[in-house]
Amino acid sequence: MKMHNIIVIPVYKQVISKWEEMSLRQCCKVLSAHIIYLVTFVELDCSAYYKIAEEYKVKLIRENFDSPYFEGLAGYNRLLISRNFYQRFSRYDYMLIYQLDAYVFRDELDEWCDREYDYIGAPWFENYASHEEGSRLWLVGNGGFSLRRIKTFINILNDNNPILGCKALYDRYNERPTLVKLWDVLKSLIGWHNNINYYVQEYEDQEDLFWTQYLPSLGIKLNMPTPTQAISFSIEKSPAFLYGLNENKLPFGCHAWQKYEYNTFWKQFIN
């Protein structure tokens, strides 16, 4: 069955850089068969983005959210763990988050959607380091070029049932006096400080870590490929090493190509 998917490009500034323009042009060139959204705020002049897209006969659909989400990285992270963000796109099956430091090499979007993962991103190395620093592949994965199953994200964010069980709650409140601990455990077993709304509000780190590490630590696990499987979807750090691990084949796309090994590796493919 063909999945209904979209590309979502978050933008927060009027002037587009040289690198961002390369990224946007490649997106419009390679993924023009798909619906492409610009996610931004109402006050932003996006004419530079529209002008580039028009050269490829691509119509960018604008979707506005509150401006504080675009005032810095913290705001962006809040947006991508919010119920409202995914609910806006609930009529689609999958979204490809395509930040403008990503680059796509060929159109494999339908193929990856057909695999029915909940989340795919470039694999990380242990301690967020690199192969060159002696780290091994660890887990999936980076959110800058990532595929997300929208229904799964909505279902998680709509579920207000208690999350942690009795043992985990005892461990959480272990340092409190016994009666206080018992009372807090009982309250938490019916949802007090123990539902998705609470954990979303308390969370202050990167949004991709929320989905790939924080939620699994609470017992909520997404269907994701292994890090080795994800190499053919996207790569970020240690691109030359991962390219070799992928039998010298380019992945579907990549992230932060201008940041990691551009002159020594990526320049032969992206220029």
Residues covered by each model-derived region:
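Catalytic core and acceptor-binding pocket of nucleotide-sugar-dependent glycosyltransferases
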Residues: 141-270
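Short beta-strand/turn micro-motifs composed of small residues
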Residues: 9-13, 38-42, 121
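Short beta-strand-to-loop acidic/aromatic patch adjacent to the donor-nucleotide binding site
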Residues: 92-104
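Short, acidic, metal-binding catalytic loop of nucleotide-sugar glycosyltransferases
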Residues: 24-34
